[in-house]
Amino acid sequence: MRIAILGGTYNPVHIGHIFLAKEIEYLLNIDRVIFIPTCNPAHKLIDENVSVSNRIDMLKLALENEDKMFIDDCDIINGGITYTVDTISCVKKKYKNDKLFLIIGDDLFQNFDSWKDPQSIVSSIELVVAHRIYKERLKSSFKHIYIDNKIIPISSSEIRNRIVNGLPVSYLLPFGVLKYIKDNNLYVKKVNV
């Protein structure tokens, strides 16, 4: 089986994530896309008002009608700071006989040499770079594949900011995720009284 790995905070998961997963299915002839929510990513802070449980619930809602997309909670179970090299080690144990592809955006790829043990990553899995912010391909000495995907110019941080400022986000999120955010008052300004 050909399996693509998409790690991220998914805070919140949005249509850009789902669209990229669909593009990956098509462009790389992928049988399964596995979303791996990070516990505490090494490269960013997570809003403490949104729990790991909230992020996983939103992912479940976003993927409920997708038959090739699944969630793996290996990073959550391991806890602590999440490093991709450790995630890959965990995933390779579960999918020993499968061809694995790690998908990262070019925004992360531009600093790939600063990741923990990047050479080990590219030696153990196919690294696939998706366009996220750059139209041209970035050069690197690390072995990788570039895909010519459509760029959907949205981000989770932009969605959080729009919610805080009362701006519409309904077409940026799967409906179930939008409803979950509203029902749980996520990302809204907290007023101290």
Swiss-Prot record:
Its EC number is 2.7.7.18. GO terms for biological process: NAD biosynthetic process. Keywords: ATP-binding, NAD, Nucleotide-binding, Nucleotidyltransferase, Pyridine nucleotide biosynthesis, Transferase. It is an enzyme of class 2 (transferase). It catalyses: nicotinate beta-D-ribonucleotide + ATP + H(+) = deamido-NAD(+) + diphosphate. GO terms for molecular function: ATP binding; nicotinate-nucleotide adenylyltransferase activity. Pathway: Cofactor biosynthesis; NAD(+) biosynthesis; deamido-NAD(+) from nicotinate D-ribonucleotide: step 1/1. CDD domains: NMNAT. Catalyzes the reversible adenylation of nicotinate mononucleotide (NaMN) to nicotinic acid adenine dinucleotide (NaAD). Belongs to the NadD family. NCBIfam families: cyt_tran_rel (TIGR00125), nicotinate (nicotinamide) nucleotide adenylyltransferase (TIGR00482), PRK00071.1-3 (NF000840). This is Probable nicotinate-nucleotide adenylyltransferase. The gene is nadD.
